[in-house]
């Protein structure tokens, strides 16, 4: 089934020069980039995006990090795009769960700065795309 998913290349991925390689991996996976935007997220957008974590002790740090510098927000489309992107991204915790050869396995050093984000379900994708690309 053709799906769309939100992707974020977080500030650490932009700062460390991984944007080109990440986009290349997306295209090699057969996924299509339908939107791509370099921007610095504002607090309101970040807080909406991470609302499910608002009661967690790391929420403030997460919002501070994602708004600290430019990131790339995008929409990727393709067959089972959500699962395909999550497979490319690798596990959330780069040391314990991200396999070498995945984006996080190759580029991330900590769970807090783990290079990329991707929606985890069709419902999350719809919600997150609406937050980052409200005019679509």
From Swiss-Prot:
GO molecular function, one term: metal ion binding
Annotated catalytic residues: 117 (pros-phosphohistidine intermediate)
Keywords for this protein: ATP-binding, Cytoplasm, Kinase, Magnesium, Metal-binding, Nucleotide metabolism, Nucleotide-binding, Phosphoprotein, Transferase
Binding annotation for ATP: 10, 58, 86, 92, 104, 114
Disulphide bridges, residue numbers: none
Enzymatic class: transferase
Classification via InterPro entries: NDK-like_dom, NDK-like_dom_sf, Nucleoside_diP_kinase, Nucleoside_diP_kinase_AS
Cofactor entry: Mg(2+)
GO biological process, one term: UTP biosynthetic process
Its EC number(s): 2.7.4.6
Family matches, as SUPFAM superfamilies: Nucleoside diphosphate kinase, NDK (SSF54919)
Reaction(s) catalysed by this chain's protein: a 2'-deoxyribonucleoside 5'-diphosphate + ATP = a 2'-deoxyribonucleoside 5'-triphosphate + ADP; a ribonucleoside 5'-diphosphate + ATP = a ribonucleoside 5'-triphosphate + ADP
Assembly and interaction partners: Homotetramer.
HAMAP family assigned: NDP_kinase
Function: Major role in the synthesis of nucleoside triphosphates other than ATP. The ATP gamma phosphate is transferred to the NDP beta phosphate via a ping-pong mechanism, using a phosphorylated active-site intermediate.
Family according to the record: Belongs to the NDK family.
The protein's name in its UniProt record: Nucleoside diphosphate kinase
Organism of provenance: Corynebacterium jeikeium (strain K411)
Taxonomy of the source species: Bacteria, Bacillati, Actinomycetota, Actinomycetes, Mycobacteriales
